[in-house]
Amino acid sequence: MFVLRPLIVGLTLNLYAPANHAADIPVAPAPGAVAKALAAAAPGDTLRLVPGTYAETVTINKPVTLLGGPGVVLDPSVPFKPDWKPAADIGPGVFRAAVKQRPRTLFLNGKIVAEVDFREAGESGDWGWKTLLAKGPPRAGFKFIPAIWGYHAGQKAVYLRAPDAKDPATLALTQVTDNVAVVSFRDVDGAALRGVTIAHGFAGVSVGEGARRCVVADCAIGPWDRTGVSISAGASENVVERNRVTRGALEDWAPGDGSKERYEIWQLHKSVGHSDRIGVQLFRAGRANVVRHNHVHETFDGVNVGDYTVESLDKPLPRPDDGRETAIHDNLIERTRDSGIEIGGGAIDVHVYGNVLRQTHGGLRFKVPRVGPVYIHHNVLDGGAPFNVWFSMDDAPARGYVYHNTIVGGTAGVQYSSFVKPHNIGTPNWHFVNNLVVTKNGFFGNRKVEAPVNFAADYNVVVGGGKPYPKDAAKDAHSKYVEKVELEKDLRPSPTGPAIDSGIDLSTYLDGKPLPGCPKGYFKGAAPDAGAFEVK
């Protein structure tokens, strides 16, 4: 099974140089089989996993391909069968079990059980861990979050309230005990992971320090606890494509009706849990990473690029080049409990286009992008629940262009909301042109933010009002605010409606040069159509 092919160069034995003919090596399920095959592989080899479950986590640190197919699963979880005892002092239906090793993630019937961080929650109050285990969140109880668990470090014990207060000893519980990804790329140029199901990990795939030109493609990634795919530590020129990424929570993570009761799902994880769970995260990533043609659903955030430690203009930006030249395109991102796509940090030369965001709570969210330029175009935002394009946390001084997008549903097309401490800068370098906006509150809404409305907006077609400059007729002079726009099922506007030929030619918008995606001759009629589609 394992092939060692040394190259003789003069009198030197080189164990790591690629052979003239890379090997195609079959690997069958066995304890540690993938790790052993990786250790023995030569650069350029393909490790072809035969169908079955591989119960391990692995690190790829050679330029090899790990190739799966239908029925190939990497799943490091193991049964969790401690000695459960009723914890009557906490509440009916709550059980306790002493453990030698802390579970990092707990699964019930293969789905992730919501975890409370006892350190964050404290013991008392409606959101104290004892109250949550006994009664659930204060408004909905266990209606939307059917099970809750947590680890007590002082007692070295796990507490669990299972669905319907069942005895955990009768349930199919599994765990992972390591806080690592199922597959990690480290110190490697040109490795690939293709066609593998990544299931029941603390994290799915980590593309980290020293990883360059690696590929994660055609994989089913989930369930996972913290992050589906992460690109971090300066990893550059990597591609994440054609994957299905979903967290696999026991509770329903679709945005739902926006009620305060359902909002408690977000509160439990963000306030007393372990914060965001992100489908694809680029955190302090390097240059020119690409995220494309993926289906990301039922996560908190879909795809993020930025750095949560610099989400205020009061904080310095020590690494403005993080995430430079990131491309996020042609993804389907839907039913997210929080943002569909988030952009922050330096955001230099970031391109977001061709994506469909459907029923996302946070839509396309800007978290203090500082520099730019950011190009956001030809996206479809459908059914925002409630946000679409959303400036949050603080003013956004970056230069940005938002054009040829179709926005349907939700409250307003563009909003200021949730500024923690605005700095009276606003968004002076942002341009909104040639967009089609069909929403309840029209183009712009401001949710109690004291920041100047100073972006440029023009040549948009809008249903619902919401003019950004109602007292200045000279601004936004060419936009059309109309009563109705007929849309096809795919949200293309009617060929006889007001969106047709309503835009401005963007092939010369940048000092005579085109905006990305708008080369000379890119439209069919007398002028471009507003929105993501060129109809007529």
Describe the function of each predicted region.
Residues 83-94, 176-183, 200-203, 223-232, ...:
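Extracellular beta-strand/beta-solenoid scaffold signature
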Residues 56-57, 61-65, 351-368, 372-492, ...:
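Predominantly extracellular beta-rich ligand-binding scaffolds that present long acidic/polar faces
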Residues 33-36, 40-207, 212, 222, ...:
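Extracellular polysaccharide-degrading/modifying enzymes targeting complex plant/algal/animal polysaccharides
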Residues 183-192, 210-215, 231-241, 277-290, ...:
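Surface-exposed loop/turn motifs in large extracellular/passenger domains
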Residues 43, 48, 54, 60, ...:
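Repetitive beta-strand solenoid architecture
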